[in-house]
Structures are given as structure tokens and as C-alpha cells.
Amino acid sequence: MQKVLHITADKCTGCLQCEMACSFENYGTFATAKSRIKVFNFHHTGKKVPYTCTQCDEAWCLHACPVEAITLDKATGAKVVNEATCVGCKVCTIACPFGTINYVQETGKVQKCDLCGGEPACADACPTGAITFIDANWTGLGKMEQWADKLGNQPTAV
């Protein structure tokens, strides 16, 4: 059973525990700048929203990489950067429509969420349950896709 990160924005307090846990898990240091998850602050509303790679089914980053450094981890469903293969060309950062792949100056490589090998530190660290790691079927995405197919909800130009 595939699992996904599920974010409930209304529960986020902006404590940054997710960013700290991520940076510690991946770099052994508490540095939000090194985190693969970010908390966006909507200053005009006071809302905080965590965001990270959505592990797209049709991952543009994976297809765009000229050296095939981004591959699918079949166990977790995550699209993972192989740092030994990555040449730091940043094509994947341009291809990602969500801006969740970042270039790391220190290494000359890119980084993105890899779901921590199936045990995301951000979800474990979130004190409010704003970030959870749940069965993909629970999100209802499959049912929404089935309804869209049945209804033929294709965009049309008027």
C-alpha cells in the first residue's frame, strides 16, 4: 500500500518543527534553510502552510533530468535524487511546476523530498497533526479521478 504526505493547512501553527526535523534527518543539523519541506507564511491572512514535493504520478522532474538522476523508489513511491548521478544542471528545478526541488550550493546538486525512505521525519515531528503520512487511498484521490472520468470533465474552450 502506497502512502502519501497529507497536509491539513488549518492545523499548521508555523512552529517549523517539520523543517527542523527534515534538516536534521537529511543533514544532521537543525537548519531550516536545508529543509526539503517549507512552511509558507501568508502574511496578509496569518495562515501558515507546509509544502513539499507532491511525488507526482507524472513527475516532470524525473522526465526532464538529462542524466536520469531522479528515479522512482518503488517501495515508497517517492521520486528520489541520486546525488552520485546528479550533475547539478537544475533542469528538474525548472520542470517542477511546484518549485519543490532546490539547488544546494554546497554540494552542487539538487535536493527534494524522498519521504525519508518511508518514514517522513516531518510527519513524525508535527505536533498538531498538520502533516500526516497516510494510505494513498484514504485521500480519496482515486475516487475523484474515477468521477472525473465518468463525467468526462475535460476542459473546454468557449
Positions of PLM-derived features:
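A positional/architectural concept
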Residues: 10-30, 35-42
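Flanking helices and flexible, charged tails adjoining ferredoxin-like Fe-S electron-transfer domains
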Residues: 2, 31-67, 72, 83-158
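Local sequence-structure signature of Cys/Sec-based thiol-disulfide redox active-site neighborhoods
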Residues: 4-9
